[in-house]
Design a protein with these regions (language model features):
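N-terminal subdomain of nucleotide-sugar transferases
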Residues: 1-61, 199, 243, 409, ...
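A short, well-ordered alpha-helix in the C-terminal region of glycosyltransferases
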Residues: 360, 367-382
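Short hydrophobic beta-strand element within catalytic cores of glycosyltransferases
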Residues: 296-299, 317-328
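Conserved donor-binding/catalytic core segment of Leloir-type glycosyltransferases
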Residues: 210-231, 236-241, 253
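Membrane-proximal helix-turn-helix segments that form the acceptor-binding/catalytic region
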Residues: 97, 114-117, 121-125, 151-172
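Carbohydrate-associated surface elements
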Residues: 176, 194-197
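Nucleotide-activated donor-binding/catalytic signature segment of Leloir-type glycosyltransferases, i.e.
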Residues: 247, 262-289
Length: 416
């Protein structure tokens, strides 16, 4: 069938569900096109070679990509963020109204909720099915980030309820998220939980080792991703400083960008000036090679009930890399990592516990750390792999199309 993949973020941005996802759907017999924004995430600035215009069509890996106008912004300003989300809502809505009839089904990636709201409207007008994949639970996450007041949060809640009612099927990324949605009135029969997979790609055979800057002679703790409020990386910096008191070789490397980067750099300069390095954002393949050379991978989320129901895609990625993990997480993500045997899990924002965990893994032999990493890879391949997730996703798409066809046939018979 002809599928429109609607997502605000897509290559060359660090999008989790990007060209690889679209190509996988196409490889399984579907004709896929993408509607997305001009790339500006995570820094809020347009990528080189792009200029804002109403519309631009390009091709990425053989997939037709429709670029729609957006207000570039991803800073701490609520006004800028709202303009960013609403501008893409309107351009996605116009695109869907004008061209939506060309497709048999729309697959929407959320967050943010605004593309899904646009799809809910134009799919209702065109009488076509749409599937919503939920990676981040709104409005909870917006409230937790302090980006919006109570009035806006309540409005977003109503928008989410509207989207969930209109969606043909919904894909939450964790079992606990599914339960939270059910508590809000979404029928279980309408939801299909599918875990994320890793975008990690192993180095090719015969690849030479190229140590990242500042890696040699150190015990390298690596974080790669968004430097935002939810990650509370100041705590990771504090834990590194504490662990390095006993083991001076411990060094934290932060790869990526985000609204907290400047504040984190200032904090690191005060508490751990010789034990933290900011490398900025790097490409996906380059980041995977950094992970390959890391001694330890780190992930943390804010101590908030919201984050107990999400499984950050970083969890799957780190497991696939085959490196030991220290995780400041709670809930389903913590359970997965504990079950894998590849991680030491500590409570979120518990600096002493994280420092102890980093020190414990630093004290292990290379063989012991390698064994932990292999456990993670085995767990990922068995329970969380790409092929399994894609097959499950294709099954949901086919089911949504079949449900819609049945409803349409039943409606026609009723009116006939």
């Amino acid at each position: 069938m002809r599928i429109l993949f609607l997502t605000q973020w897509f290559e060359p941005e660090p999008a989790f569900k990007g060209a690889g996802f679209a190509a996988a759907l196409r490889a399984r017999g579907h004709d896929v096109e993408v509607a997305t924004a001009f790339p500006n995430y995570p820094g809020g600035k347009l990528y080189p070679g792009y200029h804002i215009r109403p519309y631009r069509r390009e091709t990425i890996n053989g997939i037709a990509v429709h670029r729609l106008a957006i207000w570039p912004s991803h800073n701490a300003s609520p006004i800028g963020r709202i303009a960013n989300y609403l501008s893409f809502f309107f351009t996605a809505l116009v695109f869907g109204l004008l061209r939506g009839r060309r497709y048999d089904l729309v697959y929407v990636y959320h967050p943010p909720i605004t593309p899904a709201a646009a799809a809910a409207i134009f799919c209702a007008i065109h009488r076509m099915p749409f599937v919503v994949e939920i990676q981040d639970l709104w409005p909870d996450s917006v409230g937790a980030s302090n980006m919006a007041g109570n009035r806006i949060t309540r409005l977003l809640g109503k928008v989410c309820d509207f989207v969930y009612r209109r969606a043909t099927l919904i894909i939450p990324q964790s079992s606990m998220m599914l339960e939270r949605l059910h508590e809000r009135g979404v029928p279980r029969v309408k939801m299909r939980r599918i875990y994320n997979w890793a975008t990690y790609r192993p180095a090719g055979a015969g690849a030479t080792v190229a140590y990242p800057k500042g890696f040699k002679g150190r015990f390298n703790v690596v974080y790669g991703g968004n430097l935002g409020q939810a990650q509370v990386l100041a705590d990771a910096i504090d834990a590194t400083a504490c662990a390095a008191l006993d083991r001076p070789a411990i060094h934290l490397h932060l790869f990526g960008d985000g609204i907290e980067r400047q504040a984190l750099e200032m904090h690191a300069a005060k508490v751990a000036p010789t034990h933290v390095t900011f490398h900025g954002p790097v490409g996906r393949d380059a980041m995977d090679r950094v992970f390959d050379e890391a001694d330890l991978l780190l992930v943390q989320l804010k101590d908030d009930p919201l984050y107990t129901i999400t499984v950050p895609s970083k969890v799957q990625h780190y497991l696939a890399c085959g490196r030991p993990i220290v995780a400041g997480l709670a809930g389903e993500a913590a359970e997965l990592l504990t079950e894998s045997g590849a991680a030491i899990v500590c409570p979120p924002q518990d600096v002493p516990a994280m420092a102890t965990a980093i020190g414990r893994i630093a004290a292990m032999s290379i063989t012991e750390r390698a064994a932990m990493g292999h456990l993670g890879q085995d767990y990922y391949n068995t329970h969380l792999g790409f092929d399994r997730a894609i097959e499950d996703t294709v099954a949901v798409i086919d089911e949504a199309a079949a449900l819609w066809a049945l409803r349409k046939r039943t409606s026609n018979e009723h009116h006939g």
